[in-house]
């Protein structure tokens, strides 16, 4: 389970992890699932994904999402709904999943990409309230006194 500093940490992260595990179990080609903030912090992960790997996947997914958003802005193509990266042995899907959050899935290369995209959209709709990630606020220096 990935920890989140909010007061709802245990409940929220536990619910997210359960929903991500459900996705991995139902769609057999999905290897791993992670929920991340737009700045690349993992806030939930499927079972079987080590914390270090969840954090790495979240950072990579955040980078791809950021690049896609930049391309959309630069070329007047609008917002990004989903980013997909095809590798020799896997696909990486990244989709917006609520205010300030993304859902990332790593799948086998044999995955039905249409089915994966459909299931991602269902998951995002089903758990939108769990996927809200408030923007981080910079720490203020202590008051002089």
Where are these regions (language model features)?
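Acidic, low-complexity cytosolic segments
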Residues: 1-30, 39-145
């Amino acid at each position: 389970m990935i920890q989140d500093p909010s007061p709802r940490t245990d409940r929220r992260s536990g619910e997210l992890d359960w929903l991500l595990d459900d996705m991995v179990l139902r769609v057999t080609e999905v290897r791993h699932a992670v929920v991340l903030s737009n700045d690349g912090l993992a806030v939930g992960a499927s079972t079987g994904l080590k914390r270090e790997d969840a954090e790495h996947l979240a950072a990579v997914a955040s980078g791809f999402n950021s690049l896609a958003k930049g391309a959309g802005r630069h070329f007047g193509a609008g917002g990004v709904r989903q980013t997909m990266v095809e590798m020799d042995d896997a696909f990486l899907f990244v989709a917006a999943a609520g205010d300030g959050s993304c859902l990332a899935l790593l799948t086998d290369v044999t995955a039905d990409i249409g089915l994966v995209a459909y299931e991602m959209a269902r998951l995002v709709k089903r758990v939108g309230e769990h996927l809200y990630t408030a923007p981080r606020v910079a720490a203020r220096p202590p008051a002089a006194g």
